[in-house]
């Protein structure tokens, strides 16, 4: 009986990691669509967001079934609760990437664009944080989770610097307001995306240590 339960817990973790990988792939495509202003790719990202939503629902149903039908130990409870909470964060992260794709559709050519290099670095760091987290999670590496979450401070710095630049450009040139507004949405989505990564890092620390920490 216990062996079967352990197998189900392993399958649950694999489903969670698969959802995380799907979010990572979606984020990569969203940032590529942004860099290339590829509206066709942006449309595809928006249309496929339901796959992430379905993945979240399936994982939550599995968690509920395991809690209701099995007799989990304390460590099992921590694991299932951590997965359930974290998959909700992954779903929201997918929503933010769909939000970036929607903003790409609204961008006008030959109008305001902020520091592309800084925006690229912000996106690149967000992707690396999620990729590192997906490696650390199955290993239950709390120390790695803490170091990943600490990178959110750099994301915030990018956000504030880009916000200041974009608002300044919008003030100087009224015609830049439509694009500027969309870029403010974009960097806001990236900032929240990284915040959710930090949330999952907190759950990974809880999973290993049983301690509730604030890393965000």
Curated annotation (Swiss-Prot):
Keywords: Cytoplasm, Phosphate transport, Transport
Location within or outside the cell: Cytoplasm
GO molecular function, one term: protein homodimerization activity
Domain of life of the source: Bacteria
Gene3D superfamilies in alphabetical order: Phosphate transport system protein phou homolog 2, domain 2
UniProt record, GO biological process: intracellular phosphate ion homeostasis; negative regulation of phosphate metabolic process; negative regulation of phosphate transmembrane transport; phosphate ion transport
Entry GO terms, CC: cytoplasm
Keyword Transmembrane helix: no
Pfam families cross-referenced by the UniProt entry: PhoU
Alphabetical list of PANTHER family matching this protein: PHOSPHATE-SPECIFIC TRANSPORT SYSTEM ACCESSORY PROTEIN PHOU
Summary of the function given for this chain in its UniProt record: Plays a role in the regulation of phosphate uptake.
Complex formation: Homodimer.
Family membership: Belongs to the PhoU family.
The protein's name in its UniProt record: Phosphate-specific transport system accessory protein PhoU homolog
Lineage, top ranks: Bacteria, Bacillati, Bacillota, Bacilli, Lactobacillales
């Amino acid at each position: 009986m216990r062996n079967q339960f352990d197998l189900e817990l392993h399958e649950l973790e694999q489903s969670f990691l698969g959802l995380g990988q799907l979010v990572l792939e979606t984020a990569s495509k969203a940032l590529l669509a942004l860099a290339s202003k590829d509206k066709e790719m942006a449309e595809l990202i928006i249309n496929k967001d339901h796959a992430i939503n379905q993945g979240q629902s399936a994982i939550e149903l599995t968690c509920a079934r395991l809690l209701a039908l099995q007799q989990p130990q304390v460590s099992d409870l921590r694991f299932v609760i951590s997965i359930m909470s974290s998959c909700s964060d992954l779903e929201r992260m997918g929503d933010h990437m769909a939000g970036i794709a929607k903003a790409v559709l609204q961008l006008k050519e030959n109008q305001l664009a902020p520091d592309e290099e800084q925006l690229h670095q912000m996106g690149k760091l967000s992707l690396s944080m999620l990729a590192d987290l997906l490696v650390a999670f199955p290993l239950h590496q709390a120390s790695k989770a803490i170091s990943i979450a600490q990178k959110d401070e750099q994301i915030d710095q990018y956000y504030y610097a880009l916000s200041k630049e974009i608002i300044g450009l919008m003030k100087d040139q009224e015609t830049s307001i439509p694009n500027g507004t969309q870029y403010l949405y974009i960097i806001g989505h990236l900032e929240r995306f990284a915040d959710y990564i930090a949330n999952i890092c907190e759950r990974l620390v809880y999973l290993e240590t049983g301690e509730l920490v604030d890393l965000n």
